[in-house]
Amino acid sequence: MSERAPVVTVDGPSGAGKGTISQLLAERLGYKLLDSGAIYRVLALAAIHHNVELDNEESLTLLAAHLDVQFVTGNEGKGIKVVLEGEDVSTTIRSQECSNAASKVAAFPRVREALLRRQRAFAEAPGLIADGRDMGTVVFPATPAKLYLTATAEERAQRRYNQLQDKGFDVNIDQLLSEIKERDDRDMNRSVAPLVPAEDALIIDTTNINIEDVLDLALTHIHQKLQVPA
């Protein structure tokens, strides 16, 4: 396939820093941003709202085909606003319930196929930062600029704990760690689009690296691969 605009893919497990780096890259390069994980979270939330069982692939696929979701940018560095059926669900979809449900619905091949075309449609000028789990391996495999961020499960659990605490959610870090390990196992071993780095991706372990250094590594890679101005 050929992308209609420059695309940078940022893949990796939950809590590795994909969201933060993707937003910083979009701001630095002036590119649009796609939070692929949000699409699955929105679908999971829509399923909950419409009383669709999370193990019903046929109903989920039908819901995905008609999913009314928009990503509204321009929030002055505060990320994108996720809108489902006219309602701002940016905070709601970040709950642990939606996070776990999203991983479940994403495991269905027909659901992923239904959302694949919509994700690719986000590749528009001047460029796109695509944040997800299979952006470089499935959605935008032709782009030369691929990143894969990772970190230890313990570090990712701590980051998730801090994030949810800041948003006012009551969470238990041991439970978060257990859920992250379970999700890693589920995502890495599923039959369709398992969570693995693209062969040509730059792998960055963010466990002991500050965000500025991660950003520098990412920008250097992007400049080399896309030949965009530094």
UniProtKB/Swiss-Prot annotation:
**Which catalytic reaction applies to this protein?**
CMP + ATP = CDP + ADP; dCMP + ATP = dCDP + ADP
Entry's transmembrane regions: none
Q: What is its main location?
A: cytoplasm
Residues that hold ATP according to the record: 12-20
Which terms in the GO cellular component ontology are assigned? Answer: cytosol
Keywords for this entry? ATP-binding, Cytoplasm, Kinase, Nucleotide-binding, Transferase
Q: Would I find Iron among this entry's keywords?
A: no
A Pfam family of this chain: Cytidylate_kin
Record EC number? 2.7.4.25
Q: Which Gene3D superfamilies match?
A: P-loop containing nucleotide triphosphate hydrolases
GO MF annotations, alphabetized: ATP binding; CMP kinase activity; dCMP kinase activity
HAMAP family reported in the protein's UniProt record:
Cytidyl_kinase_type1
Entries under PANTHER family matching the protein: CYTIDYLATE KINASE, CYTIDYLATE KINASE/PANTOATE-BETA-ALANINE LIGASE
**Which protein is depicted?**
Cytidylate kinase
Question: Which species is this UniProt entry from?
Answer: Shewanella halifaxensis (strain HAW-EB4)
